[in-house]
Amino acid sequence: MKKIKEAEQRKLRRKKRIKDKIGRGVASRPRITVFKSNRYFYAQVIDDSKGHTIASISTIEKSLNLGKNIDDVKKLGEVLAKRLKEKNINNLIFDRNGYKYHGLIASFATSLREFGINI
């Protein structure tokens, strides 16, 4: 039990360190944050000055019919990039939310970059 609490505390410290470095998202450059559960992958674009979610996407959406593997997360990045282009948002601050920049997180960010979003 002690190891679990220590791991959780390390993750919270990592999240705080990352947030302190990247700053807050504003309307001209909102923050995109990601979350991984055991079954799904979520991402949302947040304007921290207003406290509003501008856009969100996840593999749980029935219309997308995606799973939680690297290829599906790349498709998720493509769909989100198209949604952001419709709203004229091209610049984002990427918040990896304490996760390592590896695997799903890295492929999602790369997919956004490939479709014209500056991170």
Swiss-Prot record:
Oligomeric form and interacting partners: Part of the 50S ribosomal subunit; part of the 5S rRNA/L5/L18/L25 subcomplex. Contacts the 5S and 23S rRNAs.
rRNA-binding recorded as keyword: yes
Coiled coil ranges: none
Basic and acidic residues composition-biased segments: 1-10
A Gene Ontology cellular-component term: cytosolic large ribosomal subunit
Function comment: This is one of the proteins that bind and probably mediate the attachment of the 5S RNA into the large ribosomal subunit, where it forms part of the central protuberance.
Keyword Ribosomal protein: yes
CDD domains linked: Ribosomal_L18_L5e
PANTHER family, sorted: 39S RIBOSOMAL PROTEIN L18, MITOCHONDRIAL, LARGE RIBOSOMAL SUBUNIT PROTEIN UL18M
Record-linked NCBIfam families: L18_bact
One GO-annotated biological process of the protein: translation
Region listing for Disordered, in residue ranges: 1-20
Sequence similarity: Belongs to the universal ribosomal protein uL18 family.
SUPFAM superfamilies: Translational machinery components
Organism for this UniProt entry: Borreliella burgdorferi (strain ATCC 35210 / DSM 4680 / CIP 102532 / B31)
Protein name: Large ribosomal subunit protein uL18
Record keywords: Ribonucleoprotein, Ribosomal protein, RNA-binding, rRNA-binding
Example of a GO MF term: 5S rRNA binding
